[in-house]
Amino acid sequence: MEELFSIDQLDLERLLKEWRWLCPQPVTLLARNGFGDLFLRTAEGKVLWLDVGGGTLSEVADSESVFRDLLKHAPQRELWLAEAVLEAGARHGLKPNNVQCIGFKIPIVFAESAAVPDNAYVADLYEQVSFLGDLHRQIADTPDGGKVRLRIGAPPARR
């Protein structure tokens, strides 16, 4: 399987810094998609999908070999890699490189994002993944449709 984005030069700890509230266990990076989602292998060999847009971490395969086999099937590739959406973005000039991803001015976790024209842009991968980790940490306990108040800046000091 040919990877869409090289992961060789990525700093996993930097990518996961704002996600350790959701993913505290030691993991290695297997792959990523064009939206900054990360596919991680646990010490036990299971494969996890960190969906940075949705703010979820889910087990998707019992092993790396099962994960790679699943990626040979178009429906699974579309679910995890969103290749058709990436191709559509590329036709509109959105072509992230290996340290970039497609981000959204209003994150897709907010219903309002669907109404924003030209919401997508090419973002720095580290900044986007970090921002979304902090965002999802702040709204993790908010019910769907609930009101949120976001804090931009350093997190409050822990006591």
Describe each model-derived feature in a short phrase.
Residues 46, 69-75, 90-104, 144-154:
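Short, highly charged low-complexity linear segments
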Residues 1-49, 106-159:
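A surface-exposed partner-binding patch
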Residues 77-129:
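Mixed-charge (acidic/basic) macromolecular-recognition segments
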Residues 50-87:
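Compact, glycine/acidic-enriched structural inserts
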